[in-house]
């Protein structure tokens, strides 16, 4: 039988080609995800997306130290520009993974973590408005703890993921306004976070500070202060009293012409490392270190519920539920942290958090205590009925009494009777609630805290006001929309807009999604399975081609030279100058 080399080579070549095609299909399915093309769609002022005027919605993602929370806000223009109103567009979307924990991860891992959250929050916005809705992913204390290099790499990855896998509005990459895009994905300073929280606290309380510079500007005494304690940091924000903070204009009204100018008259202080998660970790770590210095493998911890056991750095730590001792421990650690950071109080020139009197005067008739301040006091109120009846406006003295009762409760009883009672206290946070209640006293009191007296009852511990959440993300959305509104009526702002904003126009590139099932979770699952099957097919085809090549080489070596060109028996197989039957 004649040697069939050419036909076999054609077959093996085809297998290699099939392997290559399947490999490319696998790569596209596994790593391509949703793709977008750009089409020209009307005109844009270029630069910052807010230069185009008030957006229909704004999405702000709070990338905190304990997880991410995405918020969508609806922006409605007022009857007279530049007035507008802002309200939440549905419930926030939570992601348990802290963004900072994704530092150093691949783009695929970052995508898997944040894209489902962004898709879900996009569903809060009408489909036709998503391409005109800007998104801002802003990180707080957790990301501030990363190095500058880690942050830059993380933000570069996040930017690429959001730009290529969502339809939210972002600055054109062709524009020379790189800082505009960077503003969408960045780590914000603690002072910014605090100011945004203050804006939100006032807005939901009926004090529209975005009306500054108009005849509708609120009166100074109407404003409220904001206190915010998270997992990594704590902030206090308050409009300074007249004569102590540069207040100008009519003594009863806010004289600032813009939010940027108003920020200069607001006392904003943010303290990194004194939030609940960071502070408790440090307290337990130091307690374990002290035990190891004395060659002990067991020790007690005053900030744990009585009998609660936890192992830290190889040391078994048993809670004793001593509330007052816990407060003193936190006060000492807070002062130590301030000394390490070189931060002294402007009021006392000592290493503490004390705010100046001008920030605490009765001009701020009320302060709103947010985030952990609400969660911890609400826990005391619902988990120990009757111990905090004055909630949501208890004094520090009343919180102290309730905290002593809670911390002294046997851990076994806490697990049996308290776990699951408070919707804001998940099981994994329950052991830390004794510490949290003591932290309130330490951070708000007069020893090392902000300076509130034990018997004062002007702090409202709230999660929302009239159904509106009190979170800094709302303040951020207010600030962004305010700039857009002012720019739309010709008021000078800090926005980086192209020169064409005064009359000309430039091409605006709109992103359009392409691909089947590109945006849905089901679509991604289908793509992965298709990718795996294509990859498997490519591997099988390649192995078959290689096996065939090896077999061909063996046959080639065993075949007589004459038979490589002639048929068996040496009979010439040439016909019309070509080889046949091969």
What are these regions (language model features)?
Residues 1-16, 549-571:
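Helix-loop boundary elements of multi-pass alpha-helical membrane proteins
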Residues 61-69, 227-234:
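A short acidic Gly-Thr/Ser loop motif
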Residues 45-61, 65:
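N-terminal module-boundary/linker segments of secreted carbohydrate-active enzymes
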Residues 572, 577-581:
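Serine/threonine-rich intrinsically disordered cytosolic regulatory regions enriched
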Residues 58, 72, 98-130, 136, ...:
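Helical "lid/coupling" subdomains associated with nucleotide-phosphate turnover
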Residues 75-82, 241-242:
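Short loop/turn segments immediately following beta-strands, especially the blade-tip
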Residues 19-34, 541-551:
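Membrane-embedded alpha-helices of multi-pass membrane proteins, especially ion channels
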Residues 30-45, 82-88, 488-498, 554-570:
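Interhelical loop segments of eukaryotic multi-pass membrane proteins
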């Amino acid at each position: 039988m004649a040697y069939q080399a050419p036909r076999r080579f054609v077959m093996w070549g085809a297998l290699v080609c099939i392997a290559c095609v399947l490999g490319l299909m696998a790569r596209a399915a596994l790593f391509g995800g949703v793709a977008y093309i750009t089409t020209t769609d009307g005109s844009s002022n270029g630069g910052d997306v807010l230069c185009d005027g008030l957006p229909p919605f704004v999405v702000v993602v709070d990338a905190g130290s304990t997880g991410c929370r995405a918020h969508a806000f609806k922006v409605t223009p007022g009857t007279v520009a530049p007035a507008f109103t802002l309200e939440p567009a549905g419930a926030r979307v939570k992601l348990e993974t802290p963004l900072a924990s994704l530092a150093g991860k691949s783009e695929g891992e970052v995508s898997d973590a944040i894209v489902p959250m962004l898709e879900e929050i996009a569903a809060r916005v009408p489909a036709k408005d998503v391409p005109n809705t800007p998104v801002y992913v802003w990180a707080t204390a957790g990301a501030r703890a990363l190095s500058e290099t880690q942050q830059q790499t993380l933000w570069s990855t996040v930017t690429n993921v959001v730009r290529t896998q969502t339809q939210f509005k972002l600055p054109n990459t062709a524009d020379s306004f790189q800082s505009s895009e960077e503003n969408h994905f960045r780590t914000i300073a603690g002072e910014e976070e605090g100011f945004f929280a203050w804006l939100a606290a006032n807005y939901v309380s009926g004090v529209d500070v975005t009306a500054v510079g108009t005849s509708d500007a609120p009166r100074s005494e109407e404003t409220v202060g904001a206190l915010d304690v998270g997992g990594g940091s704590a902030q206090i924000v308050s409009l300074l009293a007249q004569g102590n903070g540069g207040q100008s204009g009519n003594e009863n009204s806010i004289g600032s012409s813009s939010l940027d100018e108003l920020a200069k008259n607001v006392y904003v202080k943010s303290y990194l490392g004194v939030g609940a998660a960071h502070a408790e970790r440090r307290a337990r770590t130091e307690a374990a270190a002290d035990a190891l210095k004395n060659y002990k493998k067991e020790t007690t911890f005053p900030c744990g519920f009585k009998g609660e056991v936890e192992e830290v750095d190889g040391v078994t730590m048993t809670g004793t539920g001593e509330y007052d001792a816990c407060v003193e421990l936190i006060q000492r650690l807070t002062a130590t942290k301030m000394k390490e950071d070189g931060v002294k109080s402007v009021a006392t020139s000592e290493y503490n958090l004390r705010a100046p009197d001008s920030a605490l005067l009765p001009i701020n008739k009320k302060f709103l205590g947010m985030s952990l301040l609400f969660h911890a006091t609400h826990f005391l109120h619902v988990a120990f009925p009757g111990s905090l009846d004055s909630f949501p406006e208890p004094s520090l003295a009343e919180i102290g009494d309730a905290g002593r009762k809670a911390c002294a409760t046997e851990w076994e009883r806490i697990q049996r009777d308290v776990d699951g009672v408070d919707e804001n206290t998940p099981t994994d946070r329950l052991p830390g609630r004794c510490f949290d209640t003591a932290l309130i006293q330490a951070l708000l009191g007069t020893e090392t805290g902000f300076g509130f007296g034990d018997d004062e009852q002007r702090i409202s511990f709230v999660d929302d006001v009239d159904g509106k959440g009190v979170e800094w993300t709302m303040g951020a959305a207010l600030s962004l929309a305010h700039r857009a509104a002012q720019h739309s009526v010709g008021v000078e702002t800090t926005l980086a807009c192209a020169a064409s904003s005064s009359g000309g126009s430039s091409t605006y590139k709109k992103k359009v999604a392409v691909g089947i099932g590109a945006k849905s979770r089901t679509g991604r699952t289908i793509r992965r399975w298709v990718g795996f099957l294509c990859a498997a097919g490519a591997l099988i085809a390649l192995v078959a081609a290689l096996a065939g090549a090896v077999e061909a080489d063996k046959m080639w070596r065993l075949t007589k030279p004459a038979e490589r060109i002639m048929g068996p028996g040496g009979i010439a197989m040439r016909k019309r100058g070509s080889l046949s039957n091969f």
